[in-house]
Amino acid sequence: SLSDKDKAAVRALWSTISKSSDAIGNDALSRMIVVYPQTKIYFSHWPEVIPGSIHIKEHGKKVMGGIELAVSKIDDLKTGLFELSEQHAFKLRVDPGNFKILNHCILVVIATMFPKEFTPEAHVSLDKFLSGVALALAERYR
């Protein structure tokens, strides 16, 4: 679980990186579909599933909007992300294992874009936070 120190670190990092959240989302999703091509199946309804496409950019923006929501609900992710969990479980039917894959891609992109801010301490706190987000999103699968 997230300590007060972790929550403060996530909030501090988010205040810096949120201005670039659209680019982070685009880069993370683009990376995910290249490194983990099996994830493309969730986007087969798009005319093209290629890095940097308009659909990837739009969905990356949505994903990062979800991360922003999670930051604002950091004290109770399970309740705060209930509707997103329902949507992913029952409407989108995303395998919850893919949340971990996308989390990894988000971490890589943030580390690349913000090397100074992505300290080892920020890394561990953000990783714990994203793991908490994945767990909260998987809640409705049970």
UniProtKB/Swiss-Prot annotation:
GO molecular function, one term: oxygen carrier activity
Residues in Globin domain copies: 1-142
UniProt-annotated binding residues for heme b: 88
Keyword Iron included in the entry's annotation: yes
GO terms under biological process: hydrogen peroxide catabolic process
Binding-site residues for O2, renumbered to this chain: 59
Tissue: Red blood cells.
N-acetylserine: modified positions: 1
A single cellular component GO annotation: blood microparticle
PROSITE patterns, A to Z: GLOBIN (PS01033)
Stored CDD domains: Hb-alpha-like (cd08927)
Domain of life: Eukaryota
Function: Involved in oxygen transport from gills to the various peripheral tissues.
Subunit structure: Heterotetramer of two alpha chains and two beta chains.
Protein name: Hemoglobin subunit alpha
